[in-house]
């Protein structure tokens, strides 16, 4: 009976299910985009291969917001610490032309000592001041090839090579070049430290904190756990607002749909009540139909989310969208709960109808 009632009005059912699907897709995609970008950034930072990362006081864990540069002379003091094998200073800038990409200014020798060097798809390492390396994902997304010219940060660069992704940034230039462009002479945004043995990391971190008590000292093996929305000011609030908007959309659509349904089925409700149907039975019918609509919409929304992810990644290879079972279930639950709340008043209204008046309704 419930399924028949839902299918009896196919157009309204379709529109309602689409609205719920949009709600579910909106939640999954917003969370998937933010989570994917955070996780991808964390993996790139861990991929540098260092054991410890040092940033200026109060610097953000997100490299594009890494704070004021530090004196590069700090690197010489860090090299003197016990168990330290290599230290690589890095200056971080971000390029906002055609997207937002992190640019690393590196000293090739020290960066190679920490990261074991780049894996080249084509070309060669940095040799001239205007050389730039791009990773394979950036090259694919922007259609960049070795030997081409690039204009970023108001500067013309020569693409010296395309490297495997996962070394902290997508673009790499000489440290001295980026220092001059940024007006940050003898400065660095980050120091990466490679220890002689991984188990010496806690001891080295203690020494660094004694040497630089106000600086941010982070072990890179736990970096992924730090890349959450709560560590980026405003991101958690943004996600909650978007979820709230999605819930309101679902609530209003279900409310209007079920309210109209109750009005149209007034005589039917009168017949049921005249045959002895209880208020609880009427409420269960309305809420069961709502649940069925929300389930159909949720399933469609999940499918639409995976379809959109496939399309977006094909169109924008540098984009990362993480869809997890946890958020698929949460988005579905949000849609169903919001739908039931939206149907609560129409269900209550239906249960309160007087059978005599309902049967006389035209």
Please state what every model-predicted region is.
Residues 246, 267-312, 330-334, 338, ...:
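Transmembrane alpha-helical interface segments in multi-pass membrane proteins
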Residues 52, 138-139, 160-165, 186-211, ...:
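A short beta-strand structural signal in non-transmembrane regions
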Residues 10-37, 233-268, 291-300, 341:
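Hydrophobic alpha-helical transmembrane segments of multi-pass inner-membrane transport and secretion
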Residues 90-91, 99-109, 118-177, 186-187:
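Hydrophobic secondary-structure segments that place a key small or acidic residue at a functional site
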């Amino acid at each position: 009976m419930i399924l028949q009632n839902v299918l009896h009005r196919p157009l309204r059912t379709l529109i309602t299910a689409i609205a719920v699907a949009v709600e579910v897709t909106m939640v999954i995609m917003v969370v998937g985009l933010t989570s994917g970008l955070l996780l991808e950034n964390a993996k790139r930072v861990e991929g540098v291969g260092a054991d410890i990362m040092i940033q200026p006081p109060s610097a953000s864990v997100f490299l594009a917001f890494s704070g004021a540069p530090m004196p590069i002379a700090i690197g010489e003091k860090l090299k003197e610490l016990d168990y330290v094998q290599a230290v690589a200073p890095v200056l971080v800038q971000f390029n906002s032309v055609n997207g937002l990409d992190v640019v690393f200014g590196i000293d090739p020798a020290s960066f190679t000592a920490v990261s074991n060097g780049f894996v080249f798809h084509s070309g060669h390492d940095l040799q001239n001041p205007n050389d730039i390396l791009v990773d394979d994902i950036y090259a694919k997304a922007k259609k960049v090839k070795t030997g081409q010219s690039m204009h970023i940060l108001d500067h013309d660069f020569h693409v010296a090579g395309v490297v495997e992704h996962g070394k902290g940034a997508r673009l790499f230039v000489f440290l001295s070049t980026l220092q001059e462009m940024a007006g940050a002479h003898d400065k660095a945004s980050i120091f990466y430290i490679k220890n002689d043995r991984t188990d010496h990391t806690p001891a080295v971190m203690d020494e660094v904190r004694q040497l630089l008590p106000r600086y941010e000292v982070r072990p890179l093996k736990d970096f992924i756990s730090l890349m959450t929305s709560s560590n980026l000011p405003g991101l958690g609030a943004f996600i909650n607002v978007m979820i709230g908007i999605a819930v309101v959309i679902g609530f209003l659509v279900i409310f209007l749909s079920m309210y109209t349904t109750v009005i149209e089925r007034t005589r039917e409700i009168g017949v049921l009540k005249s045959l002895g149907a209880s208020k609880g039975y009427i409420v269960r019918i309305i809420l069961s139909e709502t649940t069925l609509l929300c389930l159909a919409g949720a399933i469609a929304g999940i499918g639409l989310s995976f379809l959109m992810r496939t399309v977006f990644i094909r169109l924008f290879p540098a984009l990362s969208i993480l869809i997890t079972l946890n958020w698929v279930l949460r988005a579905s639950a949000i849609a169903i709960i919001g739908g039931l709340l939206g149907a609560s008043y129409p269900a209550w209204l239906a249960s309160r109808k007087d059978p005599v008046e309902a049967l006389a309704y035209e």
